[in-house]
C-alpha cells in the first residue's frame, strides 16, 4: 500500500504522512470475533502506574486473531482485509469451508479471494501455515511459535519476518531481523510470507494530538524533574545529570543489557549484539 501526503493547509497537515488504507474494509469488524477492551491507563490491579506515558485514546474493540493456526487441512477463503487498531499489521478475515470464520495476520501479497490452509505440509505461498520441519530452508516466515501449540510470538508486527536458515536434531534455526540466530523446535508452526503494512515505519503523525488518539501521553525527561522524582533531577539551571543515564529507579539505560533468562540462552546461537562488537 502506498503512502499519503497532504497539502500544508495547517501545521499539523504539513508533515503528515499516512498509509493509504483505501483498499481495506470500511465497515465494522466481524461481530463474533471481537471483544470489549477496557482501558487500563498503564495501571495494574492495585491502581499503580506500571507503564508510564499511557492513557486516553480512542475507544477500541479487540479483534480475536488466531495466532495458533491449528485447524488442519481445511481450506479457507480470504473474505476481506481489515485495519486493526490494536496492532501495526493489517488482519484478514478468512472463512473456512465448514463456515467458521477467523481473523489471521495478513501477510504481504495476500488479497481478497485467495485461499489459505494450515497443514502438516502445504504449498509455500503467503498465508499458508505449517510446522517448521515441513518448510523449505531459505523461506521467509512470520508468526513463528517459540513453543509448540503456544501460538505465534515472533515476527508479528508490520513488515516483520524471519528466515529459516537450517534444521538440525529436531530444531529449526531462524534468523531474526535483529541479526539474532536462534533455535526453535521444528514442531512449532510458522506462516509463510512477511507481515503486511511494511510502510508503517514511514508514518509521520504530524502533531501531538494524533499520538494522544493512540493512547500515548507525553514523555518527560528526567533532567527537568526534581531530585525527588528522578536521579537526574535538580540542580540550578541546565545540568548534564552528572552520571551515566539511568531510569527513574536508578537502573542503567541506553544500551545496558537486561536479559536475565539464562535457561533459554542455549537456544540463541548468535546474539543480536555480536554485530556491534566487531
Swiss-Prot record:
GO MF annotations in UniProt: rRNA binding; structural constituent of ribosome; transferase activity
Family under the similarity heading: Belongs to the universal ribosomal protein uL2 family.
Gene Ontology process terms (BP): cytoplasmic translation
Summary of the function given for this chain in its UniProt record: One of the primary rRNA binding proteins. Required for association of the 30S and 50S subunits to form the 70S ribosome, for tRNA binding and peptide bond formation. It has been suggested to have peptidyltransferase activity; this is somewhat controversial. Makes several contacts with the 16S rRNA in the 70S ribosome.
Quaternary structure note: Part of the 50S ribosomal subunit. Forms a bridge to the 30S subunit in the 70S ribosome.
Pfam families: Ribosomal_L2, Ribosomal_L2_C
Name of the protein described by the UniProt record: Large ribosomal subunit protein uL2
Keyword annotations from UniProtKB, A to Z: Ribonucleoprotein, Ribosomal protein, RNA-binding, rRNA-binding
